[in-house]
Every structure is written in C-alpha cells, then in structure tokens.
C-alpha cells in the first residue's frame, strides 16, 4: 500500500465523516498529513489562507458570530477588506467545476461584516519596545495593527493629513467610504497607536533621528504610481494616467471631459 493510500485509509478509520461539517479547524491540529496537505482550494488560493470553508459552513448553520470569529483570527479590518477583496478564492472554488459558478464567498464575508461595528483591538502585555511606522497606507496600517497587537508601543508617521494612502486617495467612495477607514484608524487609536500626520520623512537625517528614538523603524512608504503602457503616443495631450485621473476625481478637482472617451484596460482600475 502506498503512503498516500495508507493515509487515506487511516482517515477513513479515524474520522467520522457523517459528523464532519468540513469547517477546516481539524486541519490545524490533526496528526493526519493528508487532511492538512489537501486544503480546500478556496483556502489555498487565499493570500491569507483564511479558513473559508469553515466560516461558510458556520453561516449555513446560522452561526454568524462564530463565523466572524473564525475570520477575525487571520484577517484584520474585515469590514474594509470585504469591500475591495479581489476574491481569488472564488476562482478556485470547486463549484466552478460542477455548475460553472463559484460560491459567493466574498459576498458572504461582506454579509458578515458590512454594517458591523469593529471590535476593539486586543493587545498583548506591554513589551517595553517602541516602533515607528513610516506610512499610513495599507501596509503601514497593517504593520501598526500587528505590532500593537503584539504589545509594542507604535507611532505612525504619515505625510498626508489622514491615514489610508491609496485606499483613501484613489478608490471611489462608493466602493470604500471614508467612514470605514476612519473607523479602522479610530480602533487603532483607542488601542494606543499614535498617528502623526503631515510628517514626511524625506532624508537620511530624519530617518536616523527616528532610529535613535525608537527600538525599530518599519518603512511602509507609498508604492503608488501609474503604470505606463510603453506604446507610442501615450505622452500626447488628452492621454491621461488612470492613477492621476482617479486621484483628481477623489480630491474633487478632476478636469472636465467631453466627447468620446476610450479606457484602455479592463481591470478594476479601468472599471473605477
């Protein structure tokens, strides 16, 4: 008997499949490797490895609070992510092979969290360490969240007047309202994260100064910038960068367009 067949046989003998609800928790502790290795395709496709089959099964059983708890174990800011997630899990969903349509996984996540108040951030005992995070965009916010959760004292330095980075400066308000970002920042401030706005770290001297004042410095600088197509004519008058155009729209200072407009591309930026 091959190793794979032996593991399958052990599973058949040790797991009561009539009682299994496939919620994925067993895979974290089970001694049988094939349960851990053969993860649900949706979970394997998720960048954070969320226990997707777990919270979907709990929702199906009317256990919404338990489903939220399962997601919250691995996903901070679920109220925010559920509005903008690219949901690669749905592309990997087994239902696509059966009837051509995935389970609406992100829709379920949004059902669970949209409109729900964010829970306070629970922090570990104070470590005595201090950390400066430069940048309050998506990377900086997540870094500050995880560091504060671990018990470190965190200060965030942001060049703009508010936190959020591209989430606030480019995404349309119908997709991600400012109030959601404000709630994220508010929860972090309640947990003790200190935000310093209008603080642009522009040279080595400023960085060295922070390094002297804090035990560690996290660089979460903006990576924003429009991509060029490298085709002839893209620098001509009337050809606009989607990145710059969306920023102007978000700021309320967009130039007025008239006549026919061609949008090159078919992704989320093009749709926005």
Kindly give the residue locations of the regions a language model identified.
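Ferredoxin-type iron-sulfur electron-transfer modules and their immediate structural context
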Residues: 1-130, 217-237
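Short amphipathic alpha-helical segments
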Residues: 144-146, 168-169, 229-233
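Conserved beta-strand segments of alpha/beta enzyme cores
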Residues: 153, 192-194, 238
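N-terminal Rossmann-like dinucleotide/flavin-binding domain of flavoprotein oxidoreductases
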Residues: 68-78, 86-88, 166-215
